[in-house]
Design a protein with these regions (language model features):
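Local sequence-structure signature of Cys/Sec-based thiol-disulfide redox active-site neighborhoods
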Residues: 44-49
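Sec-dependent N-terminal signal peptides
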Residues: 4-13
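Amphipathic alpha-helical repeat scaffolds
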Residues: 32, 52-56
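N-terminal "domain-start" segment that seeds a small globular fold
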Residues: 19-41, 126
Length: 182
């Protein structure tokens, strides 16, 4: 009898933990730069480019390319999600309001910007822990402006390093294969 109860408890615990293990991007909720809890399930069915950003980085001008990409493809079900992080040489020292002001005034960003997070180390955001452990795309975030292209099913379709410009043919050709046809 004790064995049966122990087995039942083990099954229930295993199922409970499996139910809370994220399997897609859409299983996460993140705080926006305005402090609002945003379920990423709101982007279900869209192609999503997740980018860790910084305002004082050599790659910061990529904000312009990210906005250009967003404007070009958003009517086809594409969105960019920016996740500011201060993990690399303190290149994102600003507060959330300062980050928003910088992005909207200097680069006219209209895509969603989220609250500053950590993308590495012990305090890595669960979203980035998931992104960096997915089969075929695993590996640490090595610098600002790493990009994950997520399909409409919430699974990673491609990963690009900091040096890949958002409007490069390398990224846009992969995006075109994932986006719904016109």
């Amino acid at each position: 009898m004790k064995t049966a109860i122990t087995l039942l408890a083990l099954v229930l615990v295993t199922r409970a933990s499996a139910a809370t293990t994220p399997t897609t991007l859409f299983d996460f909720t993140m705080k926006t730069v305005d402090g609002v809890e945003q379920p990423l399930s709101a982007f279900k069915g869209q192609v999503v480019l997740v980018v860790n950003t910084a305002s004082k980085c050599g790659f910061t001008p990529q904000y312009a390319g990210l906005e250009e990409l967003y404007q070009k493809y958003r009517d086809r079900g594409f969105v960019v999600l920016a996740f500011p992080a201060n993990d690399f040489l303190w290149q994102e020292p600003g507060t959330d309001p300062e980050i928003k002001q910088f992005c909207t005034s200097k680069y006219h960003v209209t895509f969603p910007i989220f609250s500053k997070i950590s993308v590495k180390g012990n305090d890595m955001a669960p979203l980035y822990r998931w992104l960096t452990t997915q089969e075929g795309f695993a590996g640490a975030i090595t610098w600002n402006f790493n990009k994950f292209l997520i399909g409409p099913d919430g699974r990673i379709g491609a990963r690009f390093g900091s040096r890949v410009d958002p409007v490069s043919s390398e990224l846009t050709s992969k995006l075109e294969t994932i986006l719904p046809k016109k």
